[in-house]
Amino acid sequence: MTKQYERKAKGGNLLSAFELYQRNTDNMPGLGEMLVDEWFETCRDYIQDGHVDESGTFRPDNAFYLRRLTLKDFRRFSLLEIKFEEDLTVIIGNNGKGKTSILYAIAKTLSWFVANILKEGGSGQRLSELTDIKNDAENRYADVSSTFFFGKGLKSVPIRLSRSALGTAERRDSEVKPARDLADIWRVINEAKTINLPTFALYNVERSQPFNRNTKDNAGRREERFDAYSQALGGAGRFDHFVEWYIYLHKRTISDISSSIKELEQQVNDLQRSVDGGMVSVKSLLEQMKLKLSEASERNDAAVSSKMVTESVQKSIVEKSICSVVPSISKIWVEMTTGSDLVKVTNDGHDVTIDQLSDGQRVFLSLVADLARRMVMLNPLLENPLEGRGIVLIDEIELHLHPKWQQEVILNLRSVFPNIQFIITTHSPIVLSTIEKRCIREFDPNDDGNQSFLDSPDMQTKGSENAQILEQVMNVHPTPPGIAESHWLGDFELLLLDNSGELDNQSQELYDKIKTHFGIDSAELKKADSLIRINKMKNKINKIRAEKGK
């Protein structure tokens, strides 16, 4: 069996290499130090290795991403199958089609990776027999089946979450061992020697909840690396969470020397006053305390300097990501001169407090900042931690965003977080106009939920006009059919055809209505004038042909 593992490991199989590392570590502590090191480095290199592409961006040699999802009797779906792109997948469909349910199915699956990175045998989110099983499910259970890809040495990581309905005699267990096996590798290798870890996050529409800042002082709280996974898949990205964390980080980077040094300073000051008051007997003690204070300060400066650099860089990266992605913001900082902690930004050249930003800016800022914070904590070995890998789910990416910002949102996210697999939902044709059709997954408009296969649209969306995308991809007419004014131009064209291109009283009246309603510089009036010219030209040509035929 060992030979078989060795053959697979040398062929690039990650699970086999890790099995050999574990065997040599657990069962042959004396023998296999070299073997242990060999298989450990094989695993670590598989996870860590990467290259810099032509644009100067770090790319992992072994990408990790969700490849396929199948839902069976999950919520509204009898059966749904969807394939994902490695970099970006955008899901579109009418309200109630189940876009958000797809994101929650993925989030529940990802939670099993997170739970087992944090501790051996951890349990992730389970399906609910109350809310996740289709009401009329024939088999009385729900399945969420996922397949992940992690490089050529681990092409398929299949996971299935299952749940039987209440009162069902037969139990249906989930199959999560592959998730635990992979998470074990990340956890064990990281424990032996720090590695970069994947980021997983869900940003749901609740991120738009009103700003409710907690004003208590959190400067003394302790920030651990694995806090990056805290609440990551529960709809992260609340604005008040970011403000609290950012003020904490700011205070950490400018914090005073430790309390022990403050005590030494107080003792030195007290002794100095005694000596100055004539107590010569404590002069030698004063010199000893001064020396102790000097040595303690030097040690503290060295330790604090190292930690402050880390936190200072962390803060700088988050600030840079915000200014790169969030529209109109060029600077962000903490203002403390007023006696209270205020996060301020330069917005379109004006300094304002962060709670004075628009809803769209606040919502998007908190998402970007939250994601950047998590990636900085999980990727300490990367020169740019935002080039770490991971899977990020965003519901309604266009939430509160101005149309101009919708044109930039995905482009900016992909630029700042180049190795994240984004899985996104949207209702915005503007967003769709910025991405290739290969990245879009649409529901069949006639789908009744019994059997769904999400696929790419026929039309190329990137660079296309919004009106085309609305009509050909989203099956929505660019102008509302229930609005009478939207039909005037078509009615006008029909009148011209009926009257051989001439304006009679009825067509003239309709022309005047178009001119008055839409305005003299409107595209609608220009189209009406163009129709008149074209029909006059056709009429003239027809007359010439008629005369030649006599």
Swiss-Prot record:
Keyword vocabulary terms for this entry: Antiviral defense, ATP-binding, Nucleotide-binding
Domain of life: Bacteria
GO molecular function: ATP binding; ATP hydrolysis activity
Protein name: Retron Ec78 probable ATPase
Entries under Pfam families matching the protein: AAA_21
Protein's job: Probable ATPase component of antiviral defense system retron Ec78, composed of a non-coding RNA (ncRNA), a reverse transcriptase (RT), this protein and a putative HNH endonuclease. Expression of retron Ec78 confers protection against bacteriophage T5. At multiplicity of infection (MOI) of 0.02 cultures slow growth when infected with T5 but do not collapse, at MOI 2 cultures enter growth stasis.
Source organism of this protein record: Escherichia coli
Transmembrane intervals: none
Phylogenetic lineage: Bacteria, Pseudomonadati, Pseudomonadota, Gammaproteobacteria, Enterobacterales
SUPFAM superfamilies, sorted: P-loop containing nucleoside triphosphate hydrolases
NCBIfam families per UniProt: PtuA
PANTHER family on file: ATP BINDING PROTEIN (PTHR32182:SF23), DNA REPLICATION AND REPAIR PROTEIN RECF (PTHR32182)
UniProt motif (ATP-binding) ranges: 93-100
Gene Ontology biological process: defense response to virus; DNA synthesis involved in DNA repair; double-strand break repair
